[in-house]
């Protein structure tokens, strides 16, 4: 695990990255034959996500989502789906744990390059009311593995 610090003072770049994923979400849509699917919402703010995965041989071959809500939840879903394609289920669950740690203010997790673009969301940890927004897709992911489609 690489824990090199992100480049200093990139908050404006990170904000732009979040807005880009919100405005042009990656992997938005539904799968024809998912092996795992779950719908979750955040009753506090109204964010919603339907997450679908195609898992073969313990590897996430495809992942899609449909959702609506704030820029944080939708960008987090877009970033997550990009990161998870062709990732093992065990690695995906490890990443979910790292994301959760980052949202709890864990500096090592925030510097973990395995989180990719999701590191742009590290600043959300300073706003407790928004943490659930950033974790909604990850909670959907862990729930999806509890019950196949």
Predicted features and spans:
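C-terminal binding/interaction regions
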Residues: 1-29, 87-149
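Structured beta-strand/loop patches that form or line metal/cofactor-binding pockets in enzymes
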Residues: 24-67
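Functionally engaged cysteine thiol sites
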Residues: 45, 70, 133
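Short, thiol/selenol-centered motifs that function as redox-active sites or metal-ligating centers
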Residues: 67-74
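Alpha-helical macromolecular-interaction surfaces
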Residues: 74-75, 94
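Alpha-helical support elements that line or immediately flank enzyme active sites
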Residues: 76-88
């Amino acid at each position: 695990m690489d824990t090199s610090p992100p480049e200093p003072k990139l908050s404006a770049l990170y904000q732009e990255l979040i807005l880009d994923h919100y405005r042009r979400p990656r992997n938005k849509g539904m799968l024809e034959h998912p092996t795992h699917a779950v719908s979750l919402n955040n009753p506090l703010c109204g964010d919603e996500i339907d997450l679908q995965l195609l898992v073969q041989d313990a590897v996430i071959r495809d992942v899609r989502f449909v959702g609506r809500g704030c820029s944080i939840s939708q960008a987090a879903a877009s970033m997550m789906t990009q990161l998870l394609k062709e990732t093992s289920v065990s690695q995906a669950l490890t990443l979910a744990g790292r994301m959760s740690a980052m949202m709890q203010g864990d500096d090592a997790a925030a510097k973990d390059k395995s989180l990719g673009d999701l590191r742009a969301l590290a600043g959300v940890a300073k706003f407790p009311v928004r943490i659930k927004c950033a974790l909604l897709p990850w909670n959907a992911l862990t729930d999806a593995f509890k019950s196949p489609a």
